[in-house]
């Protein structure tokens, strides 16, 4: 059993409240999936930049100074915003492959959750209300988002098993049930 929520805002005046609206939806859906949760938010585009949303099992160790290390490695300015176990690196599209290689060399335990101009994927193990609070979802803005509450039935409960899954640049997937059926 899992729960899926989604919201596409047609009224731009509501964009600052997207996180607040999705938070309430995720918490309401908690009984459908209490072991892990995730959210994909679309918004906060930066001109000429891509966002790489990263996850780390040891964020204090992995994220401390990461933007400076990647900047030194690439010779270009890279900035980062951190949210609990996740961080968003802002890079130019020309640097994407170089930055991904640098991340593998510098911090091999970091996992790439999503890449795109608009998407940010946040997901973790725990009750959906706790996941929403950890990432301060209620403070996030955007144009649309999709969330998933999970109760694992055929696989282990871990961060990588939580949804959404990145399927390409600015794309993600959530599903309810076994894809093998």
Where are these regions (language model features)?
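N-terminal segments that mediate ammonia production and transfer
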Residues: 1-181
């Amino acid at each position: 059993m899992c729960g899926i929520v989604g919201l596409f805002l047609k009224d731009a005046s509501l964009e600052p409240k997207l996180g607040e609206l999705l938070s309430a939806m995720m918490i309401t859906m908690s009984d459908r999936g209490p072991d892990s949760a995730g959210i994909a938010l679309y918004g906060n585009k930066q001109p000429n930049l891509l966002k790489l949303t990263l996850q780390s099992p040891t964020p204090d160790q992995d994220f401390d100074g990461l933007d400076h290390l990647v900047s030194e490695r690439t010779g270009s300015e890279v900035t980062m915003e951190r949210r609990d176990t996740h961080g968003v690196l802002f890079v130019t599209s020309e640097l994407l492959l170089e930055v991904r290689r640098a991340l593998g060399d510098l911090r091999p335990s970091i996992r790439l959750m999503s890449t795109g101009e608009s998407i940010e994927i946040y997901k973790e193990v725990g009750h959906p209300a706790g996941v929403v609070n950890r990432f301060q979802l209620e403070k996030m803005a955007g144009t649309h988002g999709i969330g998933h509450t999970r109760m694992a039935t055929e696989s282990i409960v871990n961060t990588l098993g939580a949804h959404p899954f990145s399927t390409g640049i600015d794309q993600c997937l959530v599903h309810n049930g076994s894809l093998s059926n």
